[in-house]
Structure formats: C-alpha cells, structure tokens
Amino acid sequence: MAKNNIKNDAITPRDVDFAQWYTDVCRKAELMDYSSVKGFIIYRPYGYALWEQIQSYMDKRFKETGHQNVYMPMLIPESLLNKEKDHVEGFAPECAVVTKGGLDDLEEHLIVRPTSETLFCEHYAKIVNSYRDLPKKYNQWCSGVRWEKTTRPFLRGSEFLWQEGHTIHATEEEARSETLMMRDIYEETAKELLAIPMLTGRKTEREKFAGAEETYTIEALMHDGKALQSGTSHYFGQGFAKAFNMTFLDKDNKLKHVYQTSWGVSTRLLGAIIMVHGDDNGLVLPPRLAPTQVVIIPIQQKKAGVLEKADEIAAQLKAAGMRVSVDASDKSPGWKFSEAEMRGIPVRIEVGPRDIENGHCVVVKRNDGVKTQMDLDENLPQAIHDTLETIHKEMYDKAAAFLNSHITRVNTLDEVGKVLDEKGGYVKMNWCGEEACELKIKELYQATSRCIDEHEEADGVCPCCGKKAKHVVYFARAY
C-alpha cells in the first residue's frame, strides 16, 4: 500500500490559521456562498446535499419513533411570544421583527420565527381535549432567524436550517422519556452517520434553554480544541402548558395540564463535520453521509475501452447500492484527484489502459490517502463496500481518540487555565452548582459549562469556592 500526499495550495493550512482554513474549505468545496445580507448564506448544491442526507437519516428515525412532520408559519405575533416570560426574555435580543405590511404599519409586530414553541402551544391547545388525543409528537423541517452579531458559515448564522420537534404528553414520565430518547437519537445520528463521537449530559441552570426545566445536549470537539453544541433536547414540564392553557381530561374526567418537550439539530452539524474530519486538502466526508461515496477517474480516457470500463465499474457499484460518479471531464487526472479530495469523496478509483490489461484498478481512501490495488472482477463491489465501512470506523475511532485525549480532570483553578491555554478541549471538574462559580470560570478563562456528567457523582470540593461539590461538570471554550 502507498499513500497519496497531494497538498492543496488553495487552502490555508489548518494548523496555521484554523478560522481561515475553515472558510477556505467552505468556499473551495462549494458548500456555500455569502449573500448580500450578513449571516444569511447561500447553500450551494453540494452543501445542501449534505443537509439532505442528514434530513433523510433523521426523518426516518423520527417516523420510526412515532413522530409526524408538520409546518408552522414563519411569523409569530409578538403577544404570543410574550406569553412565556422566561422564553421571551431568552430570545428577545436576537429577534427579527416585522413592523410593516406593504407600506402600512402593522397593528401588532410580528416576530420572524427564532423557534416555534409558542406556535405549537397555541395549536396544541386548540386540538387536544382528552387523554385519547395524547401524545402529540410533531416535527418540522424549516429555517429559523436569530439576529447574530458575529456570524460564521453553518456554525452561527442569522438564518439557519434545522428541525424542531415539539411533543406533548399526559404524564411527566412519558415526557421525560421522550426528552432522553431524542437526545439519544441525536447521539446515534452523530456516530452512525457523521462518524462523530459526542459528549452528552445535562445543561446547567444558566445554560439551559429559555423556558425549559431541563436541557440535555450533545457536544462535539473540533480539531482546534473548541466545543460545539450540536443538538439539544428540552424537558419543559408544564410551564408552557399553563401559560397557553394546554389541558386535557384524563381517564377520571379530571382536567390536567400536559407535559411538554422540544428538541432540535441544525446545519451546525455541517460545521462539525468540516472541523472534526477535514484536513489541509479539504473535506473528509464519512462514507454513510457522502452524497458521492465513490468517484471513478479514468486515466488516458480517450484510449479505447477506458471510459467503457469506468462506466462498467460504476454500474456494478451502483447495483450494489453505492452512490457513484465517473469524472469523464477533459481536465487532467491530477486536477480530478485534487477536486475529489477537496470534496471529501471517501473512495477514489483510478483505472487506465494498463490497469484494464492487468485486470485491476487503484483504490485510494480519502481519510488517510492509502492506495490499494483491487481486482476488476465480481468481488469488487463487496471489496469497495468493505472499504467504505472501514473508512467510517477509522474516522470515528480517530475522532474518539482525539476527544478522549482532550478531556482533562482538574482540581484547581490554575489547572483550568493551563489546560485550556496549552491543550484545549474539555476540563472536567467538581462544581458546587452555584452560578457565581460558573461565571467566574467564564470571566477568567472565557470557558463555559458544556454539560453536567450524568454518570459520575461529585466527590470533593469546588475549586472555585471550596464548598462541597454537587456535580461533575465539563467546561470548554466553545463556538
């Protein structure tokens, strides 16, 4: 086996300037373009194809677990948003507000949806009367608008694409179970589709979603050592139910309020894919996600039989269920190799006259550049399938090793700063549960609490105040 070590000079090296590297990959791989409005990007076909793959996988999982898709309006009356005090206070600073309809001032301002809890609540209150109407488990695929001051493609935009699920239940137990199930589906999606390991846990009171009783999160670690919140699932209890009068008659004919959840992931996942797996040559896509899993590049394609053989291989692989393309453009093989690497296509097959004569082809793995000769026979589809599965495992294992090596247990404040400055990643520490100590770490080290460990009990004292610890919590600098 040999390694392919082409360097793409169009991309700033990742370890020289991570932010510029990220922007270069987004642009050069043709995932997006900037529009004339800050924070509102154009999703180019290749970038949107990645989102479609995520949609397809997750939509199937949602429907398997009893959820239905709906669509709610984009505009929310201001009075409706104001019904839940904590919720509106959390979102008011980032709301986009419509004040005119045509040339006329509106009697009531309309909020461009930052999230749709209030719309779902209003609707559920109308359609639910009895325990027989429950549960209601709705999801919508849409865009949201939150007026961000600092924007970056996919990671933080004023407009973002996402799914938001909203469910109501007759019992607290059922709603809590739903909350954790959806968090687990997000974690599964990250592992099985994106090859990204996640840190999971519960958000602190300060970091939880506005209006929620509890928020559960999946947190990814980027190559630069910063965390990225990649999905959240919220348990609301009956707060919204009481504000919106969402009630039902139970089996004993008693009037009760419902219990509610919401959960969502967004196109932030595209940013995670780039920053976890990408390298100096561009994207590195997990095979199960990649819109094109295999690209076949004919060498000396004008010679008799070369293009025909490339098409024959493509037909074989497509028949076996793989997503395949043949690059028969008139560009040079070197250009095609570079383009395939930039786009992160997991497997490249090279086939030319000599390969055909000898009955083999050259297979190149994008994740590590390893080249292998494979026979051009009926076993090729299985060999390529196995290679794709190997790539997924290697990518996940590499990301998991990076994550695990960047979780550092600390016992003092000085250690927090030292680890974050020199190593990055997560610091794992005891915490008393007081917001003042949480804020102290943010002020001193620009790090926020990412989640509370659900599996480890605190044993010791909080390094900020010396009081007995209540939780083990992870802090990190984050996007």
Spell out what each predicted region is:
Residues M1-Y479:
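NTP/phosphate- and nucleic-acid-binding module
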